[in-house]
């Protein structure tokens, strides 16, 4: 590897939308995320249902199909 061409790797604070914060390594000092291991349904065991329907579901609702 060439010297002097790689970005500086430092401690970074990761901030989640749920309020959870933890430290990791990154080239940025602060990283913001929408979902972390504290609020993701896979890790919490709680299922969140998305309110946004897909295009097919909207079509079926609009025209009264299944």
Swiss-Prot record:
Q: Does the keyword RNA-binding apply?
A: yes
The keyword Transmembrane is assigned to this record: no
Q: Which GO terms describe its molecular function?
A: metal ion binding; rRNA binding; structural constituent of ribosome
Q: Gene3D superfamilies recorded for this chain?
A: Ribosomal protein L31 (4.10.830.30)
Cite the binding residues for Zn(2+).
16, 18, 36, 39
This entry's comment on the bound cofactor is: Binds 1 zinc ion per subunit.
Q: Which InterPro entries match?
A: Ribosomal_bL28/bL31-like_sf (IPR034704), Ribosomal_bL31 (IPR002150), Ribosomal_bL31_A (IPR027491), Ribosomal_bL31_sf (IPR042105)
Give Gene Ontology CC terms.
ribonucleoprotein complex; ribosome
Q: Which UniProt keywords apply?
A: Metal-binding, Ribonucleoprotein, Ribosomal protein, RNA-binding, rRNA-binding, Zinc
Q: Which domain of life is it from?
A: Bacteria
Needed cofactors: Zn(2+)
Q: Which GO terms describe its biological process?
A: translation
Q: What does this protein do?
A: Binds the 23S rRNA.
Q: How does it assemble?
A: Part of the 50S ribosomal subunit.
Q: Which family does the record assign? A: Belongs to the bacterial ribosomal protein bL31 family. Type A subfamily.
What NCBIfam families is this protein classified in? Answer: L31, PRK00019.1, PRK00528.1
- Its name, as the record gives it, is Large ribosomal subunit protein bL31
Question: Mind giving the lineage of the organism this protein is from?
Answer: Bacteria, Bacillati, Bacillota, Bacilli, Bacillales
